[in-house]
């Protein structure tokens, strides 16, 4: 069930990312189209598209969706070691996506900071969408990192402790090794985003 919920979240974020991609192409093809899409909007679309597709879409689809289905199946476990932690992890990611979507409706719109998201660049650059848009984006990142860390630890413990009898680490399928390695690398990178977001907030 959690895997299906992750897939549905990935579909939703993918649709939002697709719409933002169309709007960016519209701005590039017809600059300043009737004043509907300005340069500021373009920067906001680029930033949000990158965040949604790279962080939320790919993680929800491959690690959340396929990981929840493939890991127990391939290691011979009935389910993840901590199913309730798995459920809590999903809902934290879901709330993170909801908070990020809320930044579209605040005054000034979502952040358009790009790579100047973190201080002191945000203050110096005066980027579009600064203020509430950036704060909502960073709160969303913080929730996502906490939820993903909980889910990642659950994945790792399942792979290391819930394998079927006779399955050594050397006999594990390469797909499990791939998901395990990607989870470890992501868990090394995402806490840095969390620390920077907490410093900003």
Predicted feature locations:
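Hydrophobic alpha-helical membrane-insertion segments
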Residues: 9-18, 89-107, 181-195
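Conserved small/polar residues in nucleotide/adenosyl-binding loops
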Residues: 199-201
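Hydrophobic alpha-helical transmembrane segments in multi-pass integral membrane proteins
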Residues: 51-60, 82-96
């Amino acid at each position: 069930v959690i895997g299906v919920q992750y897939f549905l979240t990935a579909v939703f974020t993918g649709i939002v990312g697709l719409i933002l991609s169309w709007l960016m192409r519209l701005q590039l093809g017809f600059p300043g189209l009737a004043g509907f899409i300005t340069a500021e909007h373009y920067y906001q679309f680029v930033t949000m598209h990158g965040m949604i597709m790279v962080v939320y879409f790919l993680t929800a689809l491959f690690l959340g969706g396929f990981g929840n289905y493939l890991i127990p199946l391939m290691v011979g476990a009935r389910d993840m070691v901590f199913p309730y932690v798995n459920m809590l992890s999903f809902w934290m990611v879901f709330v993170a996506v909801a908070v990020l979507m809320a930044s579209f409706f605040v005054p000034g719109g979502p952040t358009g900071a790009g790579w100047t998201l973190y201080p002191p660049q945000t203050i110096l650059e005066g980027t579009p969408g600064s203020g509430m848009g950036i704060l909502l984006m960073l709160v969303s990142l913080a929730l996502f990192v906490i939820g993903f860390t909980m889910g990642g630890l659950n994945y790792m413990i399942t792979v290391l402790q819930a394998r079927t009898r006779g399955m050594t680490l050397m006999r594990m399928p390469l797909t499990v090794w791939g998901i395990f390695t990607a989870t470890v690398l992501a868990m090394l990178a995402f806490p840095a985003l969390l620390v920077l977001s907490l410093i900003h907030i």
